[in-house]
From Swiss-Prot:
Quaternary structure (record): Part of the 50S ribosomal subunit.
Alphabetized GO MF terms: metal ion binding; rRNA binding; structural constituent of ribosome
One Gene Ontology cellular component: ribonucleoprotein complex
GN (gene name): rpmE
Record note on cofactor: Binds 1 zinc ion per subunit.
InterPro entries: Ribosomal_bL28/bL31-like_sf, Ribosomal_bL31, Ribosomal_bL31_A, Ribosomal_bL31_sf
Protein function: Binds the 23S rRNA.
Protein name: Large ribosomal subunit protein bL31
Record keywords: Metal-binding, Ribonucleoprotein, Ribosomal protein, RNA-binding, rRNA-binding, Zinc
An individual GO BP term: translation
Signal sequence coordinates: none
Sequence positions that bind Zn(2+): 16, 18, 37, 40
Cofactor or coenzyme needed: Zn(2+)
Pfam families noted in UniProt: Ribosomal_L31
Length: 71
């Protein structure tokens, strides 16, 4: 590797909003503030919600349905 052309690879601290502190190595050079991490993200904690409130076909049928028509 050529000397003097690569960025410095330093150890930084990533602080999550839930209070979790993660030590990582990065070229950023300063500490990071995270919104979510693996400890508090809904997908990893199992607290995710289903957002299946109907698809495009359901919206189309609701919008263009004829009152009194048989299904």
């Amino acid at each position: 590797m050529k000397q003097g052309i690569h960025p410095k690879y330093e150890e930084v601290t990533a602080n999550c909003s839930c209070g979790n502190v993660i030590k990582i190595r990065s070229t950023v050079g300063h500490d990071l503030n995270l919104d979510v991490c693996g400890e508090c993200h809904p997908f990893y904690t199992g607290k995710q919600r289903d957002v299946a409130t109907g698809g495009r076909v359901d919206r189309f049928n609701k919008r263009f349905s004829v009152p009194g028509a048989k299904k």
